[in-house]
Design a protein with these regions (language model features):
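Extracellular-facing segments of soluble proteins and assemblies that are Gly/Ser/Thr-biased and enriched
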Residues: 1-16
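Acidic, small-residue rich beta-repeat scaffolds with periodic aromatic anchors
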Residues: 17, 22-118
Length: 118
């Protein structure tokens, strides 16, 4: 698996994550067949500093996440986890600290051939 860092910006929020690819093993026509296959994207962090105006418009919140890989029983594809840190907005004028309880797990869905949140 290859996890390529990605980042973007939309509506005053910068975000970061990974685009996920797997290498196609076995015989193939490299002219017609993809050597790498896209299997999804995951978000690992965001920052609303450009939209929050120092907390005057909305609470400022920044989070980042650590990407982890683990073997998954019954699958050749690893289980992915994103363990966040930082803060998130929970309501008007409110934020809270993120921790291990906020960890998000992603598993490969063979039907869609993409990673999905579990």
């Amino acid at each position: 698996m290859l996890a390529v860092p990605t980042e973007g910006f939309e509506n005053g929020v910068s975000f970061e994550g990974y685009a996920l690819f797997v290498f196609n093993i076995g015989p193939r026509d490299e002219v017609k067949d993809n050597v790498w296959t896209y299997v999804g994207s995951i978000l690992t962090g965001d920052d609303n500093a450009a939209a929050c105006d120092g907390g005057d418009v909305m609470p400022c919140a920044t989070r980042s996440g650590k990407l982890g890989f683990a073997a998954q029983t019954g699958s050749d594809m690893p289980r992915l986890t994103v363990t966040p840190s930082g803060t998130m907005i929970t309501g008007p004028g409110k934020t809270r600290q993120l921790g291990a309880a906020d960890t998000v797990t992603y598993v490969y869905d063979a039907a869609t051939k993409k990673y999905a949140e579990k």
